[in-house]
Amino acid sequence: AEMDAQRARLEKERAHYEKVLGQIRDLGDEVRAEEIQQKIVEIEVGIADVEYRQANQRAGYVYVISNLGAFGERVVKIGLTRRLDPMDRVRELGDASVPFMFDVHALFFSEDAVDVEAELHRRFADRRVNRINNRREFFYATPAEVREELVKIQGDLLEFVEVPEAEQFRASQAIIDS
């Protein structure tokens, strides 16, 4: 549903710019017409991305996050999202149900995010926090341990943050300790 809405929004935006492009060309403003044409190309790239993701349901973003203030140093969440902005999912998880926002250790696109996530879950199965409900994707592991397994599965990672920033937690602790 989110992707359908995104596609409809992009198509509406493209139609608007195509109409404007015609009007600008009628006025003979080729410089502005080129700018509008570039915007249309960017929108078409966005539409192609949505179409690709709709056709490839295994594609998505794998994330590794932690919440030092809520769960301590040795608990991570390993999940996947197909959201257009994967940080929306991370922000959603850090809503009012936990005292601090989650820190992102890894967040990357994969053509087969389903398999990458499943393999990570398999490798950490004996460290699953909730052994009754497997949809709860929390594991007793450090970010460094997850990184080690992720490199074996995925290869080189563009970015991985081992030490959580935990800005609000650390600031809160400093106030408590003072």
Residue locations for each model-derived region?
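Non-catalytic accessory segments flanking enzymatic or RNA/DNA-binding domains
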Residues: A1-S178
